[in-house]
């Protein structure tokens, strides 16, 4: 059970704090409600670019990392399709260093032409190395583009093309900063061994003076329901052919999420899982196999993927996946299978609650979802999933017309 207190400052910043008496560290987390989904289709990759730019210093603090290091702390960040997260861990007595740094870059980021060009080069090189020049690098990008035709989930966090980053102007990025990086679009979450009211007062001290910006959010286009199967085959210079089947499913706050997460673990969570046992060990069709959910806020994807062994045709692998899907749709999962997966999730959740950084991140995440109480309710939500729910989800989701199939063939 994670206890917390919440306050919304006059400028719109949401603050959530948790007292952890067992830790000598403080975790300070800032979540900005901006990800790839908030980008202009003609200017993608900006949220990820800003993950880099936010470490380039402000007018008051030219070197962001130096004060963190002097305070014996550590910091990092990540960006996904739905949000951007910045976090700092440091000794609890130095907590105000983290609050000072985060409040300063929320308002005073110093974006110069030189800094912008330097980070553009870094991001473009990352794009090339991870997605264009690396084996299988463009596979997830191709699958997204196949499954989504309207929603901005059709591009990855890195963007649609490096040309969008190369063409970004100073005016473009300053406008993006003004639109998305301000108090009412952010959540500050803290876990440390301090009285909650004191932590809330410290948040007031450092963040209340910041002015908010009035911004009209752009609507996110809704992805139309897929009615017909989609297929794409590409050939690349890779060691082995891979096959991916992606099915649309509900978003993060839908009941679909819990059922789908259990199903994905039931299918591929370890050596005793169905897909590994049947397709890797017994039938020897695949070298590796996975089933996972994207976990996006808006309706996301349930993906089956496998790397084919030499001698396995894509048609064989696809037929094997279909057979596993049909079993899910027709034969109730055993109580033992389902209970094993539920126990694993509960254990992981309880273990994660021991870490101050996990708690700070999760407080921000659930507040962003709009249901902060869910931080203490997800175990019960997973526990409530029945074998009947798994059957119903599988029948509703794993339909041929709801499937996008990508065959990523190795050149002969």
Spans of model-derived segments:
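Buried hydrophobic packing residues in well-ordered domains
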Residues: 12, 30, 48, 86, ...
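M16/MPP (pitrilysin/insulinase) zinc-metallopeptidase core fold and M16-derived inactive scaffolds
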Residues: 27-89, 155-158, 270-285
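M16/insulysin-pitrilysin zinc metalloprotease superfamily fold
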Residues: 57, 89-122, 294-352
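A structural supersecondary motif
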Residues: 69-70, 165, 244-248, 267-308
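C-terminal regions of mature proteins
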Residues: 187-190, 307, 327-328, 332, ...
